Amino acid sequence: MTKKEMRIISRLPPEQLQLWFKARFNIAPTQEVPAVVLEAGELRQRDFQWGLRPVWSKYPIINAQAESLLQKPTFRAPFQQRRCLVPADGFYEWRKPDKTPFRFTTPDNEPFCFAGIWDAPPSPEAKPLFVIITTAASPAVKPVHTRMPFILAPAQYDDWLTDPAIAAQIIAVASQVELRSYAVTPHVNRFANDDPRCLEPAG
């Protein structure tokens, strides 16, 4: 994602955005991910590790279902106090049973933000942790997967960061962002591959 694209999702000057974000092509759970938070009334970038680690879970939790997160203690406090914007310009889902990877973008390839929540780091030297909120698949995603990341409309960004009551109303309605998709090559299946080849259409 370029600094010009990032200006769409924030009020920060381009010089600051260039320092914050670099292009990524294949981000996987447990990796470090930049996100935007609101601190003291200012938008700030923070680096997070993807996946909450509650004491009762052997493995990190990488997403939270919009339909039930307010009923789950693991997510309740982060949702009320620590919401974030996770910038992206696309995401991947894998179609079963052949596990064909598909990339989803907006029709005009504009960047967008996933709805995220975060929690404190497990130790002073660690990064804070976050999860992406998911929702039922839109018509464009449904042929590939039953779920998808919750994509916020640009008009919802400020409310998502500032008001937990309105944020709850936002995720109570399925994401309305229009998407398109195309199959990509198995190159994206390997987490270590984080390069432009991940975006190339299959065939």
Question: Model-flagged regions — what are they?
Answer:
Residues 1-203:
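Short linear sequence motif anchored by a di-proline
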